[in-house]
Amino acid sequence: MKNYFSILLILMLTTGISARETIDLSGKWMFNFGDTPTYNDSIVLPGSMLTNGKGHDVDANTKWTGSLYDMSYYYRDDMAKYREKGNIKFPFFLTPDKSYVGNAYYKKSVDIPKDWKGKRITLHLERPHIETTIYVNGKEAGHQMSLSTPHEYDLTDLIIPGKTNEIAMTIYNGIENVCVGQDSHSVTDQTQGNWNGVVGEISLKASSPKNVIHNVRVYPDVANKQAVVKAIVTNQNGKAKKSVAIATSSDKQSVITATKPIITGDTLTFILNMGDKMRTWDEFNPEIYSLKVNSGENSFETVFGMRNISIDGYDFHINGRPTYIRGTVGNCCFPLTGYPPTDEESWAKIFATCKEYGINMMRFHSYCPPEAAFSAADKAGVYLQPEGPSWPNHGVKLNAGMDIDRYLLEESKRIVDSYGNHPSFVMMAAGNEPAGNWVPYCNRWVNEMKNYDNSKVYCGASVGGGWAWDSESEYHVKGGARGLTWSKSRPSSDDDFAAEMKLPRNFKPTEEKPINTSPILSHEQGQWCAFPDFKEIPKYTGAYKAKNFEIFRDLLRNNGMEEMAEKFLMSSGKLQSLCYKYEIERNLRTPDYSGFQLLALNDYSGQGTALEGVLNVFWDNKGYITAPEWKEFCSEIVPLARFPKFVFSNSDTLSVPIEIMNASAGTIENAVLRYDITDASGKYYCKEEKPVGDIAIGKNHQAGVVNLPLAGIENPTKLTLTAELPGKAKNHWEFWVYPDEKISMPGDNIYMTDSLDSKAIEVLKQGGKVLITAAGKVTLGSDVVQHYLPVFWNTSWFKMRPPHTTGTYIDTNHPLFKNNFPTDDWSNLNWWELLNRAQVMNLLELPADYQSPIQPIDTWHVSRKLGMMIEANVLGGKLLMTTMDIDRNLDNRIVARRMRNAILDYMNSDDFNPQLVLAPETVGNFFTKQTPPIQMYTNESPDELKPKLK
């Protein structure tokens, strides 16, 4: 009966409330760009100048919004053809057809109904870029410059109802007034591009001038089962006292109302009592309420969720439950349009893909997305960290008296006002990697934002490891505790970042606070690159074209490797996936680590072309790891194995502890661990099942130890350990067992040396066999630095900082690998001994169609043909030369020992019959010639390469 009267009251109060009337202004507008408005052209909105084909043709002299740390494009001879008119292509980011920075002028005639007389009339512009100045019938209505939120103009005093009215917009997309920094993802040509236009809703709206509801904010109080609703209402009359707030669950089964608001000035405060059937919002059960506030003849609609975020020590809590962040960075890369979508469907697809890959959070790097992103995340159960639209660096500094100081705080409050009701909006940072005396500024920003809206948690800035520690941040997004140490030490899965949680880089202990006690999320974890997928090129059918990929494809073709493109993609991609797996697992097994933010699940189009995603920029899978495979190590429940190493001798006994990371919705009751070890044929070496008991939410739950004597394994064998909680989670790890064998020595029929010396020449002339172990000796290729780990981000942005290679392609059809050295066709972990910091040979003087059976994959910006082993008929003899170290410390390097023995066995077999004919001078050139160093033609560099970063 009580509910009946509540509903009756709602009906009584809402009777006679007219819907706000709207005129859609999308469609054709008169248009021009330049110094003065002439309106001699037309354009379609929503859209940008670029999507309409407007602007200046791009050429080699186009001034871009963004930093360039590699200017070689403008000087290299092999780039000259891409600087020619009609064939403009850029290697450092996607290529648009047009570019323009300046004023653009838009005008439209609109018939305004007579019955709008006496009403309040507003203009709504969703996602204009950047500054708008509005004129109505020739009179200025105002100016706004938000990069993140809609521009709203009150045109009541300028619109003439019953007449045709002229609405004109001047839109300016220069960045000097917003002062956010040229590499901010809100403006830079590295990502979305610095476009000019309006890309979301464009409309005129009429409403009552009385009881104008400007905004409604909702503050959930989960503990007390209440939601506090604050409505800003101006020009109130007596009807304001009869205002009502109505919350409705997503399934329409629950309706909660609040009447008789507390009126304090322009603020109406309602208390919604959610009751015992209150539905909370989180990643597992994203329950959403719609809210409608009625005051007089006006209404305001929004959404909210009963969601509380808090911090307890190192942990985030959502509604009182520990929550671990598995995030990716959204970089505002949308090649088809050049701007973020304003429709919910597009974002729903992105977030569904994130969930498919076990991701529960997205950080928006130096920008804030449109409202559609928040709405889609609400429904998907994805946590969001928008940022102030600024990377205040590379010409802009915080706390230095620049306009950014004022703009960033104002814009942050606008973001919270516009999108703060969305339950997915759980955290926020001021921006990315600031310059200047930024810590005092960001500390003030955090405290100001906490006071402004405490329904979120705040971080001063998302920063790399070299940046200072900002003490007021409620949580920290910080680099330093990320990456893998495999360029310096052999791979394992037994290390973690525990020490860096207590004493992060640049944390300054005090007597009051000797250690850090706040949550840390890894900043931009990953950045492992794979080779370009040239099959992707036809997908760029919109505003931006993958001309950078076309350049990289040409480089590969010009260097005789066109047919290697797909092999390079797959081999480098599998190594990339492996690196992501073990870095993510390292984070998950670190006590007190609150989570990670990957850079990124999908590719980044700019900054030199950073192909660091296992998905392309369109969020499509590239083909070398599936979502279920990825989710084994990136999910709410993950079994983890602590391998001390991944290569064993058959005289070893395997002993690997298993632990469980549980970030699910609750305790895993009566858990059972099942594990087995198999080889490629499916043969079981062990198979066990054991009860584990209850596993609470948290990390480092010990589940048992896998033990296996390896003595019975006589041949080189790859084994797989699989551990699972049946029906809940599964993970697997590959490891290798090699025989504890003697070091083979060359017989009388093979001359082994480290150079093409005179004896080698003589042996070859006599038709003999020569093995040259040239590790550390070659000069032709010495400028290419190889690590086991692949390129970080890309060599263009980081000015050829090593490593320069992205893995190695292994030709498994080569006889060497048939029996004596079984292998994958990529550099899996058993190759670490042979590849890490090993020299490569530059094969530029060999025939164009020759490919080494062990072929390191060079940076796609150069694509030198490389090799670590060549075979040739020289002077009638048979030569095999390798830069793998198969000579030193072989008692402790069992893979190198096996490779040495395998090579000697191969050279003694009938399979060793090189068809490539080389002159001795060509072989000798590997020891004498050098290629000139790659020049960047600029002294500018990213922050990470600057020695005194703060």
Tell what function each PLM region has:
Residues 748-794, 873-876, 903, 950:
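Short alpha-beta junction capping motif
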Residues 501-503, 776-781, 796-894, 912-950:
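Catalytic beta-strand/loop cores that center a nucleophilic Ser/Cys/Thr
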Residues 160-164, 235-311, 705, 712-743:
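Extended acidic/polar, glycine-enriched regions
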